From Swiss-Prot:
Taxonomy of the source species: Bacteria, Pseudomonadati, Pseudomonadota, Betaproteobacteria, Burkholderiales
Protein's name in the database: Acetylglutamate kinase
GO annotation (BP), single: L-arginine biosynthetic process
Main subcellular location: cytoplasm
Pathway involvement of the protein, from the record: Amino-acid biosynthesis; L-arginine biosynthesis; N(2)-acetyl-L-ornithine from L-glutamate: step 2/4
Superkingdom, natural source: Bacteria
Residues the record marks as site: Transition state stabilizer: K37, K256
Family from the record: Belongs to the acetylglutamate kinase family. ArgB subfamily.
Keywords: Amino-acid biosynthesis, Arginine biosynthesis, ATP-binding, Cytoplasm, Kinase, Nucleotide-binding, Transferase
Organism: Burkholderia cenocepacia (strain ATCC BAA-245 / DSM 16553 / LMG 16656 / NCTC 13227 / J2315 / CF5610) (Burkholderia cepacia (strain J2315))
Length: 299
């Protein structure tokens, strides 16, 4: 086991201030679910990975219920490259043929998920990994991608799905038994096929079904940026629509912001996009007053 975080260099008065600042937030979120979409640099840099594992353990210890939905795009790209296959994206979604789907299942449900679970358990937490196929968690249907150049037409991007329904029973059972669920965004369809679902979309739908107090989406940028590179700290639904229209929000940010906005409109009380490159970004956002990232509002 690794040594615990060394707080010996922090002055006692500062420690007290940190704890005092966190107290009202611990009260607010105690017993509530917080869904975290985990991805980007936070999943690949060892220092950030360890910090994230410790963060979610601390949340659980103070009575908050973190639920992790992870991505794994870079790891999938690496695995595809090893077999001589290039990744293709349309409107931020990975084109997923049968061979790619096999790689996605192996990478997300195996390598990536187990790395997260083992690290949390290594630092003293109790994490359990599952995919959307376990316990009937995520029912999926094939995603029909609208062709923007041909209205009324759709693009076939293979075994890419969208969430048809979520059965949260297995997640709630794990929470009740003091486990931290770690979920790979793979669903199953009525046609018997597995479907690759964007992790942002799964996180948003899961937060809604769990009636989560907060949805936190980690990125490799400070938050939502305007065209001049300035951070937008607070966005309403109307402002987001305008950013979609003028192309400010594009590529991989499209499903992320769409999912965040849908969650806010569906009753998730607090939705934030945060910079996962900052160590302990999860704790900073949830347990401090520090303005951080971009808040998404439904009105």
């Amino acid at each position: 086991m690794s040594e615990p975080i060394d707080l010996s260099q922090i002055a006692p008065t500062l420690k007290a201030e940190i704890l005092a600042e966190a107290l009202p937030y611990i009260r607010r979120y105690h017993g509530k679910s917080v869904v975290i979409k985990y991805g980007g640099n936070a999943m690949t840099e060892e220092r950030l990975k360890q910090g994230f594992a410790r963060d979610v353990i601390l949340l659980k210890l103070v009575g908050i219920n973190p639920v992790i939905v992870h991505g794994g795009g870079p790891q999938i790209d690496h695995a595809l490259k090893k077999i001589g296959k290039a990744g293709t994206f349309i409107q931020g979604m990975r084109v997923t043929d049968e061979e790619t789907m096999e790689v996605v299942e192996w990478v997300l449900g195996g390598e990536v998920q187990q790395d997260i679970v083992m690290l949390i358990n290594h630092f003293g937490g109790h994490a359990v990994g599952l995919t959307g196929k376990d316990g009937g968690l995520i029912h999926a249907r094939k995603l029909l991608m609208p062709d923007r150049d041909n209205p009324g037409q759709y693009i076939d991007i293979g075994q890419v799905g969208e969430v048809e329904a979520i059965n949260p029973a297995v997640v709630k059972a794990l929470q009740d038994d003091a486990f931290i669920p770690v979920i790979s965004p793979i669903g199953f369809g009525e046609d018997g096929l597995s479907y690759n679902i964007n992790a942002d979309l799964v996180a948003g739908k899961l937060a809604t079904v769990l009636n989560a107090e907060k949805l936190l989406m980690m990125t490799n940028i400070p938050g939502v940026m305007d065209k001049d590179g300035n951070l937008l700290t607070d966005l309403s639904a109307r402002e987001i629509d305008a950013l979609f229209e003028d192309g400010t929000i594009s590529g991989g940010m499209l499903p992320k912001i769409s999912s965040a906005l849908d969650a806010a409109k569906s009753g998730v009380k607090s939705v934030h996009i945060v910079d996962g490159r900052i160590e302990h970004s999860v704790l900073l956002e949830i347990l401090t007053e520090q303005p951080f990232g971009t808040m998404i509002r439904s009105h």
